[in-house]
Amino acid sequence: MEGFSFNETLMGVNSHQKVSMNSGLQTAASKRAFSLVEVTYTPWHFAYSRCSRMFDCSLQLKSTRSDRSLSIETRFVILGDTPRIDMIFSVANSVSTGSKLIFCLLSVANVLSKGIFCQSTKLVLNLSSTVILQKENESFVRKTLNKLTLPSSTRRPLNCSKMPHRETKKVLNGAFLVSYHSFLLPRIIDNDFRVLKFALRQYKSIAGITDLVIFFGDIFRVTTDIQYQPILPLLLVSHLNFAV
Protein backbone atom coordinates (compact mmCIF):
# COMPACT_ATOMS: atom_id res chain seq x y z
CA MET A 1 0.00 0.00 0.00
CA GLU A 2 1.19 3.47 -0.79
CA GLY A 3 2.54 5.42 2.13
CA PHE A 4 2.97 2.40 4.35
CA SER A 5 6.36 0.87 5.06
CA PHE A 6 6.40 -2.42 6.89
CA ASN A 7 10.04 -1.89 7.82
CA GLU A 8 9.45 1.53 9.39
CA THR A 9 6.36 0.41 11.27
CA LEU A 10 7.35 -2.92 12.74
CA MET A 11 11.10 -3.16 13.08
CA GLY A 12 11.07 -0.93 16.16
CA VAL A 13 7.89 -2.30 17.72
CA ASN A 14 8.08 -3.53 21.29
CA SER A 15 7.07 -7.15 21.74
CA HIS A 16 4.03 -6.16 23.83
CA GLN A 17 2.68 -3.51 21.49
CA LYS A 18 -0.15 -3.83 19.04
CA VAL A 19 0.08 -1.77 15.87
CA SER A 20 -3.11 -0.89 14.02
CA MET A 21 -3.49 0.85 10.70
CA ASN A 22 -6.67 2.19 9.16
CA SER A 23 -6.60 3.19 5.54
CA GLY A 24 -8.95 3.94 2.70
CA LEU A 25 -6.23 3.45 0.13
CA GLN A 26 -6.82 0.79 -2.48
CA THR A 27 -4.53 -0.83 -4.98
CA ALA A 28 -5.56 -1.70 -8.50
CA ALA A 29 -6.25 -5.27 -7.39
CA SER A 30 -8.29 -4.30 -4.36
CA LYS A 31 -10.55 -2.04 -6.41
CA ARG A 32 -11.75 -5.09 -8.29
CA ALA A 33 -12.84 -7.04 -5.24
CA PHE A 34 -12.46 -5.34 -1.86
CA SER A 35 -11.11 -2.44 0.16
CA LEU A 36 -8.65 -2.89 3.00
CA VAL A 37 -10.34 -1.56 6.13
CA GLU A 38 -7.86 -2.35 8.88
CA VAL A 39 -4.59 -4.18 9.48
CA THR A 40 -3.49 -5.07 13.01
CA TYR A 41 -0.06 -6.48 13.89
CA THR A 42 0.69 -8.18 17.22
CA PRO A 43 4.33 -9.18 17.88
CA TRP A 44 5.04 -12.53 19.54
CA HIS A 45 7.41 -13.41 22.35
CA PHE A 46 8.68 -16.26 20.25
CA ALA A 47 11.64 -17.03 18.04
CA TYR A 48 12.87 -20.25 16.49
CA SER A 49 16.35 -18.78 16.14
CA ARG A 50 18.25 -15.81 17.55
CA CYS A 51 17.56 -13.65 14.52
CA SER A 52 13.89 -14.26 13.86
CA ARG A 53 10.64 -12.71 15.02
CA MET A 54 7.04 -13.79 14.64
CA PHE A 55 3.95 -11.61 14.33
CA ASP A 56 0.22 -12.14 14.15
CA CYS A 57 -1.60 -10.09 11.56
CA SER A 58 -5.32 -9.42 11.25
CA LEU A 59 -6.78 -8.04 8.02
CA GLN A 60 -10.31 -6.69 7.80
CA LEU A 61 -11.57 -6.44 4.23
CA LYS A 62 -14.82 -5.16 2.75
CA SER A 63 -16.18 -6.05 -0.66
CA THR A 64 -16.43 -3.14 -3.08
CA ARG A 65 -19.37 -4.79 -4.83
CA SER A 66 -21.58 -5.67 -1.87
CA ASP A 67 -21.79 -5.43 1.91
CA ARG A 68 -19.85 -8.65 2.36
CA SER A 69 -16.73 -8.65 4.47
CA LEU A 70 -13.66 -10.85 4.85
CA SER A 71 -11.58 -11.33 7.96
CA ILE A 72 -8.20 -13.02 7.66
CA GLU A 73 -5.95 -13.97 10.56
CA THR A 74 -2.36 -14.49 9.47
CA ARG A 75 1.03 -15.20 10.98
CA PHE A 76 4.39 -14.30 9.53
CA VAL A 77 8.05 -14.45 10.42
CA ILE A 78 10.85 -11.94 9.97
CA LEU A 79 14.10 -13.78 9.25
CA GLY A 80 17.24 -12.00 10.36
CA ASP A 81 17.62 -8.22 10.36
CA THR A 82 16.45 -7.80 6.78
CA PRO A 83 12.78 -7.12 5.94
CA ARG A 84 12.37 -10.52 4.36
CA ILE A 85 9.06 -11.93 5.49
CA ASP A 86 7.42 -15.32 5.18
CA MET A 87 3.70 -14.68 5.02
CA ILE A 88 1.28 -17.39 6.07
CA PHE A 89 -2.49 -17.38 5.84
CA SER A 90 -3.84 -19.38 8.75
CA VAL A 91 -7.57 -18.73 9.07
CA ALA A 92 -10.13 -16.98 6.89
CA ASN A 93 -13.77 -16.44 7.79
CA SER A 94 -16.11 -15.08 5.16
CA VAL A 95 -19.75 -15.09 4.15
CA SER A 96 -18.64 -15.22 0.54
CA THR A 97 -18.65 -18.55 -1.29
CA GLY A 98 -17.28 -20.37 -4.28
CA SER A 99 -15.42 -18.55 -7.01
CA LYS A 100 -16.13 -15.12 -5.50
CA LEU A 101 -14.27 -16.13 -2.37
CA ILE A 102 -11.38 -17.50 -4.41
CA PHE A 103 -11.18 -14.25 -6.35
CA CYS A 104 -11.16 -12.25 -3.15
CA LEU A 105 -8.44 -14.38 -1.56
CA LEU A 106 -6.27 -14.19 -4.65
CA SER A 107 -6.75 -10.43 -4.72
CA VAL A 108 -5.66 -10.29 -1.08
CA ALA A 109 -2.57 -12.28 -1.97
CA ASN A 110 -1.82 -9.93 -4.83
CA VAL A 111 -2.15 -6.85 -2.64
CA LEU A 112 0.00 -8.30 0.12
CA SER A 113 2.74 -9.35 -2.25
CA LYS A 114 2.83 -5.97 -3.99
CA GLY A 115 1.96 -3.40 -1.38
CA ILE A 116 1.85 -3.96 2.35
CA PHE A 117 5.17 -5.76 2.49
CA CYS A 118 8.48 -5.37 0.71
CA GLN A 119 9.10 -6.70 -2.78
CA SER A 120 11.09 -9.65 -1.49
CA THR A 121 8.07 -10.97 0.41
CA LYS A 122 7.43 -14.69 0.06
CA LEU A 123 3.77 -15.49 0.33
CA VAL A 124 2.19 -18.90 0.75
CA LEU A 125 -1.51 -19.34 0.08
CA ASN A 126 -3.03 -22.78 0.58
CA LEU A 127 -6.55 -23.14 -0.80
CA SER A 128 -8.84 -25.96 0.25
CA SER A 129 -9.66 -28.51 -2.43
CA THR A 130 -13.33 -28.29 -1.48
CA VAL A 131 -13.43 -25.01 -3.35
CA ILE A 132 -10.54 -25.00 -5.76
CA LEU A 133 -11.24 -28.39 -7.29
CA GLN A 134 -14.92 -27.89 -7.95
CA LYS A 135 -15.34 -28.17 -11.71
CA GLU A 136 -17.54 -25.10 -11.93
CA ASN A 137 -14.81 -22.99 -10.30
CA GLU A 138 -11.72 -24.44 -11.93
CA SER A 139 -11.79 -22.36 -15.10
CA PHE A 140 -12.54 -19.16 -13.21
CA VAL A 141 -9.74 -19.75 -10.74
CA ARG A 142 -7.17 -20.44 -13.42
CA LYS A 143 -8.17 -17.27 -15.28
CA THR A 144 -7.86 -15.33 -12.03
CA LEU A 145 -4.44 -16.81 -11.31
CA ASN A 146 -3.26 -15.74 -14.73
CA LYS A 147 -4.25 -12.17 -13.95
CA LEU A 148 -2.07 -11.99 -10.84
CA THR A 149 0.99 -9.78 -11.14
CA LEU A 150 4.01 -9.59 -8.88
CA PRO A 151 6.76 -7.00 -8.32
CA SER A 152 9.40 -7.13 -11.03
CA SER A 153 12.04 -8.22 -8.53
CA THR A 154 10.13 -11.45 -7.85
CA ARG A 155 9.01 -12.07 -11.40
CA ARG A 156 11.53 -14.61 -12.59
CA PRO A 157 11.05 -18.04 -14.13
CA LEU A 158 11.30 -21.08 -11.89
CA ASN A 159 13.00 -24.26 -13.02
CA CYS A 160 10.29 -26.85 -12.48
CA SER A 161 11.86 -29.65 -14.51
CA LYS A 162 12.58 -31.71 -11.39
CA MET A 163 9.39 -30.96 -9.53
CA PRO A 164 7.00 -33.79 -8.65
CA HIS A 165 3.47 -34.09 -9.99
CA ARG A 166 4.56 -32.60 -13.28
CA GLU A 167 1.13 -33.10 -14.79
CA THR A 168 -0.47 -30.81 -12.19
CA LYS A 169 1.97 -27.94 -12.05
CA LYS A 170 1.70 -24.68 -13.89
CA VAL A 171 3.98 -21.64 -13.90
CA LEU A 172 2.06 -18.39 -13.47
CA ASN A 173 3.66 -14.94 -13.44
CA GLY A 174 6.62 -15.85 -11.28
CA ALA A 175 4.55 -18.15 -9.10
CA PHE A 176 4.29 -21.88 -9.44
CA LEU A 177 1.27 -23.99 -8.80
CA VAL A 178 1.47 -27.59 -7.63
CA SER A 179 -1.38 -29.83 -6.58
CA TYR A 180 -0.66 -32.31 -3.79
CA HIS A 181 -2.77 -35.32 -2.90
CA SER A 182 -1.46 -36.51 0.45
CA PHE A 183 -0.40 -35.14 3.82
CA LEU A 184 3.21 -35.98 3.04
CA LEU A 185 4.28 -33.19 0.74
CA PRO A 186 6.98 -34.43 -1.63
CA ARG A 187 10.41 -32.96 -2.03
CA ILE A 188 10.68 -29.91 -4.24
CA ILE A 189 13.95 -29.31 -6.05
CA ASP A 190 14.96 -26.15 -7.87
CA ASN A 191 18.40 -25.59 -9.37
CA ASP A 192 18.64 -22.13 -7.80
CA PHE A 193 17.83 -23.24 -4.25
CA ARG A 194 18.60 -25.91 -1.72
CA VAL A 195 16.59 -29.07 -1.61
CA LEU A 196 13.53 -28.59 0.58
CA LYS A 197 12.29 -31.51 2.62
CA PHE A 198 8.76 -31.19 3.93
CA ALA A 199 8.88 -33.28 7.11
CA LEU A 200 5.14 -33.45 7.70
CA ARG A 201 4.65 -37.11 8.59
CA GLN A 202 4.65 -36.05 12.23
CA TYR A 203 1.83 -33.59 11.59
CA LYS A 204 -0.89 -35.78 10.08
CA SER A 205 -3.29 -34.59 12.75
CA ILE A 206 -3.30 -31.17 11.10
CA ALA A 207 -6.22 -31.37 8.69
CA GLY A 208 -6.46 -29.79 5.30
CA ILE A 209 -2.84 -28.92 4.59
CA THR A 210 -2.89 -30.66 1.22
CA ASP A 211 -4.03 -30.07 -2.32
CA LEU A 212 -3.21 -26.63 -3.67
CA VAL A 213 -0.21 -24.59 -2.60
CA ILE A 214 0.70 -21.35 -4.36
CA PHE A 215 4.12 -19.85 -3.74
CA PHE A 216 4.55 -16.20 -4.69
CA GLY A 217 8.14 -15.31 -5.45
CA ASP A 218 10.88 -17.53 -4.15
CA ILE A 219 10.95 -21.02 -2.75
CA PHE A 220 11.51 -21.15 1.00
CA ARG A 221 15.16 -21.42 2.03
CA VAL A 222 14.34 -23.74 4.93
CA THR A 223 16.24 -26.78 6.11
CA THR A 224 14.94 -29.68 8.16
CA ASP A 225 17.26 -28.96 11.06
CA ILE A 226 15.76 -30.02 14.37
CA GLN A 227 15.19 -26.43 15.53
CA TYR A 228 12.85 -25.84 12.59
CA GLN A 229 10.76 -28.97 12.82
CA PRO A 230 8.31 -27.89 15.55
CA ILE A 231 7.02 -25.09 13.34
CA LEU A 232 7.51 -26.48 9.85
CA PRO A 233 3.75 -26.46 9.24
CA LEU A 234 3.69 -22.77 10.12
CA LEU A 235 6.55 -21.91 7.83
CA LEU A 236 5.70 -24.05 4.85
CA VAL A 237 1.97 -24.57 4.64
CA SER A 238 -1.22 -23.23 6.13
CA HIS A 239 -4.87 -24.12 6.16
CA LEU A 240 -7.64 -21.76 5.12
CA ASN A 241 -10.91 -22.55 6.87
CA PHE A 242 -13.70 -20.94 4.90
CA ALA A 243 -17.41 -21.61 4.76
CA VAL A 244 -18.64 -22.86 1.40
Swiss-Prot record:
Protein name: Putative uncharacterized protein YIR020C-B
Natural source organism: Saccharomyces cerevisiae (strain ATCC 204508 / S288c)
Domain of life the protein comes from: Eukaryota
Additional detail: Partially overlaps MRS1.
